[in-house]
């Protein structure tokens, strides 16, 4: 399955798409956010919205209908809220595409198009949800409106594949041990980011650290930092800054300048120091979250070693009834 042919088939079968809804939960929803950001910014003849799946079901958009494209993701394939969202969308006449890592799971039931993807550190970024999502978004843009950066998107994903191995080594060598040490020293800390990268600011907090490390932390949008949260800044408080290389970098730089003079514990992960600046500027903002996700994986693993806490351990998820 590939994004170009899939989108072409949908348009031929259903006609012009008028709205796109991205639905998932947790890390799977986060994977869809950069694609939504691409469409929010670039699309002029249709709309795009991302939903956590339960909210999509409880507050179903009135615009959901035969001209809608619903793109869902459930890594396990068994997230009931996502399956329910797909069922609701199908009943409304929408075109449904569901992504999953698990063939034969609840979501891979033959009722809609299912894209079963591989998973693992060695997989191409174009073959996993973040990459699949931005490619579907880019193809939809191109086939309905024209998208000059389509070739850059494909090329940029290949560049991400090329730069990630060295980036993983670098972040472990330069930040891994110190990050784990700071987690020992600070029971709570803040993570800042913005733009499409904010998906991974959110992800680092709720997935890599709260879910996988039971680490108390909070995410803050860099653009919102000066509209309330900066009042809590003081010496002894740890801040982790995701410094992107795209259009929103000035927001992070402004926040970082304030942090450097008002607290004594700041760690910066600067995408430009890891080769991300070589990715075409036209698409970099939408691909950079891939970089921050992969670096978060390395940092949570570094913390896990020091705390003897495997990222695979859960105490509630899939164990208790909730």
Provide a role label for each language-model segment.
Residues 103-115, 229-232, 276-285:
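Glycine-rich, charge-decorated loop segments at or immediately adjacent to ligand/cofactor-binding or catalytic sites
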Residues 2-11, 18-19, 138-221, 226, ...:
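Active-site phosphate/pyrophosphate-binding segments
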Residues 272-311, 315:
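Structured C-terminal subdomain patch of bacterial secreted/periplasmic proteins
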Residues 2-6, 55-62, 226-229:
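Structural motif
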Residues 64-67, 130-135, 233-235, 279-288:
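Short, surface-exposed amphipathic charged segments that create phosphate/polyanion-binding patches used
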Residues 50-52, 101, 216-224, 266-275:
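A generic structural motif
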């Amino acid at each position: 399955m590939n994004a170009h042919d899939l989108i072409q088939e949908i348009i031929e079968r259903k006609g012009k798409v008028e709205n796109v809804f991205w639905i998932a939960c947790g890390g799977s929803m986060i994977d869809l956010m950069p694609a939504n950001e691409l469409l929010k910014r670039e699309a002029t003849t249709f709309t795009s919205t991302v939903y956590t799946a339960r909210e999509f079901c409880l507050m179903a958009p009135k615009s959901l209908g035969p001209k809608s494209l619903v793109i869902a993701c459930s890594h396990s394939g068994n997230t009931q809220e996502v399956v329910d969202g797909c069922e609701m969308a199908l009943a409304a006449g929408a075109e449904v595409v569901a992504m999953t890592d698990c063939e034969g799971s609840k979501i891979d039931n033959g009722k809609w198009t299912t894209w079963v993807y591989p998973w693992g550190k060695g997989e191409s970024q174009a073959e996993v949800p973040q990459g699949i999502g931005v490619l579907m978004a880019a193809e939809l843009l191109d086939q309905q409106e024209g998208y000059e950066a389509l070739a850059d998107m494909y090329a940029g994903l290949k560049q991400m594949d090329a730069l990630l191995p060295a980036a993983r080594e670098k972040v472990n060598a330069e930040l891994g041990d110190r990050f784990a040490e700071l987690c020992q020293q600070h029971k709570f800390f803040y993570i800042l980011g913005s733009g499409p990268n904010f998906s991974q600011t959110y992800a680092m907090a709720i997935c890599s650290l709260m879910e996988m490390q039971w680490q108390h932390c909070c995410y803050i949008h860099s653009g919102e930092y000066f509209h309330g949260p900066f009042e809590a800044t003081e010496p002894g408080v740890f801040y982790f800054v995701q410094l992107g290389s795209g259009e929103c970098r000035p927001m992070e730089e402004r926040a970082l300048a304030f942090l450097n003079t008002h607290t004594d514990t700041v760690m910066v992960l600067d995408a430009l120091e890891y080769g991300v600046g070589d990715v075409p500027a036209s698409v970099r903002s939408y691909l950079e979250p891939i970089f921050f996700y992969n670096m978060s994986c390395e940092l949570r693993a570094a913390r896990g070693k020091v705390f003897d806490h495997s990222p695979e351990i859960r105490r509630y998820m899939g164990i208790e009834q909730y």
